[in-house]
Structure formats: structure tokens, C-alpha cells
């Protein structure tokens, strides 16, 4: 028998400043993304976490994307 879906899901976090930054401000091209898990029962809204962005070489706000 198959198990039902768990409460923990995998989410992707994307840097909010990488999209608006010009190429001259970035250390390397692209957008910083992290994958993590969240508990659907405890955290119903989208995650917003300060994480290190290697493209901008500083701590930036990372928001959950679909």
C-alpha cells in the first residue's frame, strides 16, 4: 500500500536581489537558489530567509518560489 503525503515538502529559495542587480554588480552570472524542506503544518506561508548569495558575495533575502 502507498503511504499518504507527508507534512514535510521540498521548497526552493531564490535570491531577491540577483534579479534586479546589473551584471557589473555581480561576481558571477546567474541567480542564487537553495533547496530546503519545510513543515507544511507549522509554516503555511512562504519562507523568507536571509542567506548568503555567492553571486553578490553578501547576505541577501531569499524567498520561496514554486
Swiss-Prot record:
MF terms in GO: structural constituent of ribosome
GO biological process terms held by the UniProt record: translation
Record-linked Pfam families: Ribosomal_L33 (PF00471)
Keywords linked to the UniProt accession: Ribonucleoprotein, Ribosomal protein
InterPro entries: Ribosomal_bL33, Ribosomal_bL33_CS, Ribosomal_bL33_sf, Ribosomal_zn-bd
GO annotation, cellular component aspect: cytoplasm; ribonucleoprotein complex; ribosome
NCBIfam families the UniProt entry points to: PRK00504.1 (NF001764), PRK00595.1 (NF001860), rpmG_bact (TIGR01023)
UniProt cross-references to PANTHER family, sorted A to Z: 50S RIBOSOMAL PROTEIN L33, CHLOROPLASTIC (PTHR43168), LARGE RIBOSOMAL SUBUNIT PROTEIN BL33C (PTHR43168:SF2)
Family to which this protein belongs: Belongs to the bacterial ribosomal protein bL33 family.
HAMAP family in the record: Ribosomal_bL33 (MF_00294)
Protein name according to UniProt: Large ribosomal subunit protein bL33
Lineage, top ranks: Bacteria, Bacillati, Cyanobacteriota, Cyanophyceae, Synechococcales
Amino acid at each position: 500500500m502507498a503511504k499518504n503525503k507527508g507534512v514535510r515538502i521540498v521548497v526552493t529559495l531564490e535570491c531577491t536581489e540577483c534579479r534586479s542587480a546589473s551584471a557589473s554588480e555581480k561576481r558571477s552570472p546567474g541567480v542564487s537558489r537553495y533547496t530546503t524542506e519545510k513543515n507544511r503544518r507549522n509554516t503555511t506561508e512562504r519562507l523568507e530567509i536571509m542567506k548568503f548569495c555567492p553571486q553578490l558575495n553578501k547576505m541577501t533575502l531569499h524567498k520561496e518560489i514554486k
